[in-house]
């Protein structure tokens, strides 16, 4: 009598290099074929929502950076828009353009990391090295406006922390760089920040082409991604997928176009949409999204160059007065003191505000009871819904394909576990 083989289970993660953080998955296998994939989450749970409810509206802002720690400023943007909607704050137009520009810089940062690490997980190492070279320059932009390369806390309810600087920090000589390399690195840093952005927008599309040369027609890359993790448009909508996970299946839905916020209605850009709903189509969507982000950044930079103005609301109940005003006006000094000791008071009400995050629809739901801190803060993380589709996407595939599916979902556990 032939022996019957039972399915066996293995642990994938949480210390697996392709688990994108602290993912633990229990995989039930029939030979090498996936029968069931059960993600175990919560290993990075820090109680962000509850922590934010114990802090003032301004103090809660830096928690947003630490949710999806690859797309920092877009998290801040969603939170600021929610507070502004509740408080009825008018954001100066220049601040809106700066926010949109940095939101698109963040989108490129995210997609470079997503595509680079996806390729690296599958076995192509060169892509991530090229991606990090470009990410380095974009993080220099973060550092120039906020002083931090990752957790910027640059956006504020009412605008942004400060205007764009009139210069870019330069690299200094060291024993690791000769004079020729130093000159090349500092070439685009001679002028203002907007000059640096223009130079980046000029050369970055060629760098995207280089990435495409490595992957798009690569036989091994296509074998590992075409037909893997297929999601139909109907199932994508039923599962609550958003962003590239939805557009890759052929559904043209982008919050920037369907429900425009800030100045996206003034921007000229296209929405890339997939056909087959597999890992390969989602990769192509991310590639094209980076090109569209460059278009938006260019439009914002051109507008900002010729339109000076304030970058934060003039209402001192929500934004601090200028330091020059505080030196002469008692009222301004009181406003400043009250704002940073007590915090802003937001009128009673509730709101749900969503933005087109690089990973999907990132939403912030706030209930205010009129106090200086949120009564309830709920975060709708796109990656949470995507991870719930893991079982359906992985079923019937080989064990090695799980890595490709995690990569295409672009999971970051800061936002999933919160």
Swiss-Prot record:
Keywords: Cell inner membrane, Cell membrane, Membrane, NAD, Quinone, Translocase, Transport, Ubiquinone. Gene3D superfamilies: Cytochrome-c3 Hydrogenase, chain B. It comes from the Bacteria. It is a peripheral membrane protein. It catalyses: a quinone + NADH + 5 H(+)(in) = a quinol + NAD(+) + 4 H(+)(out). Its EC number is 7.1.1.-. GO terms for molecular function: NAD binding; NADH:ubiquinone reductase (non-electrogenic) activity; quinone binding. It is found in: Cell inner membrane. InterPro entries: NADH_Q_OxRdtase_suD, NADH_UbQ_OxRdtase_49kDa_CS, NDH1_su_D/H, NiFe-Hase_large. One of its GO terms (cellular component) is plasma membrane. NDH-1 is composed of 14 different subunits. Subunits NuoB, C, D, E, F, and G constitute the peripheral sector of the complex. NCBIfam families: NuoD, PRK06075.1. Belongs to the complex I 49 kDa subunit family. NDH-1 shuttles electrons from NADH, via FMN and iron-sulfur (Fe-S) centers, to quinones in the respiratory chain. The immediate electron acceptor for the enzyme in this species is believed to be ubiquinone. Couples the redox reaction to proton translocation (for every two electrons transferred, four hydrogen ions are translocated across the cytoplasmic membrane), and thus conserves the redox energy in a proton gradient. This is NADH-quinone oxidoreductase subunit D.
């Amino acid at each position: 009598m032939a022996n019957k083989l039972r399915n066996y289970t293995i642990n994938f993660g949480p210390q697996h290099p392709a688990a994108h953080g602290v993912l633990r998955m229990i995989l039930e296998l029939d030979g090498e074929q996936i029968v069931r994939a059960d993600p175990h989450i919560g290993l990075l749970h820090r109680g962000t929502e509850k922590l934010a409810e114990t802090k003032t509206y301004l103090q809660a802002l830096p928690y947003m950076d630490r949710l999806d720690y690859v797309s920092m400023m877009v998290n801040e943007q969603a939170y600021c828009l929610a507070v502004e909607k509740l408080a009825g704050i008018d954001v100066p137009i220049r601040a809106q353009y700066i926010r949109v520009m940095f939101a698109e810089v963040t989108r490129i940062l995210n997609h470079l990391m997503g595509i680079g690490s996806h390729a690296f997980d599958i076995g192509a190492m060169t892509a991530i090295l090229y991606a990090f070279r470009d990410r380095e320059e974009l993080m220099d932009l973060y550092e120039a406006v906020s002083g931090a390369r990752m957790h910027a806390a640059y956006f504020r309810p009412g605008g942004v922390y400060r205007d764009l600087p009139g210069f870019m920090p330069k690299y200094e000589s060291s024993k690791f760089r000769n004079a020729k390399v130093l000159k090349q690195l500092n070439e685009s840093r001679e002028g203002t920040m907007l000059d640096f952005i223009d130079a980046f927008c000029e050369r970055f599309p060629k760098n995207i082409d280089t990435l495409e040369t490595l992957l798009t027609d690569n036989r091994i890359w296509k074998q590992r991604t075409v037909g893997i993790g297929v999601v139909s448009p109907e199932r994508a909508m039923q599962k609550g997928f958003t962003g590239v996970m939805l557009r890759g299946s052929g559904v043209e839905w982008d919050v920037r176009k369907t429900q425009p916020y800030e100045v996206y209605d003034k921007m000229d850009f296209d929405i890339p949409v997939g056909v087959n709903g597999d890992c390969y189509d989602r990769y192509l969507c991310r590639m094209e999204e980076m090109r569209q982000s460059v278009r938006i950044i260019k439009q914002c930079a051109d507008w900002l160059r010729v339109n000076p103005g304030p970058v934060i609301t003039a209402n001192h109940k929500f934004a601090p007065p200028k330091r020059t005003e505080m030196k002469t006006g008692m009222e301004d000094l009181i406003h400043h003191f009250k704002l940073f000791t007590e915090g802003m008071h937001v009128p009673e009400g509730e709101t749900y505000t969503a933005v087109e995050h690089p990973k999907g629809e990132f939403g912030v739901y706030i209930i205010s009871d009129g106090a200086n801190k949120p009564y309830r803060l709920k975060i709708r993380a796109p990656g949470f819904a995507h991870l719930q589709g893991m079982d359906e996407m992985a079923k019937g595939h080989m064990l090695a394909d799980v890595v490709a599916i995690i990569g295409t979902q672009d999971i970051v556990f800061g936002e999933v576990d919160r």
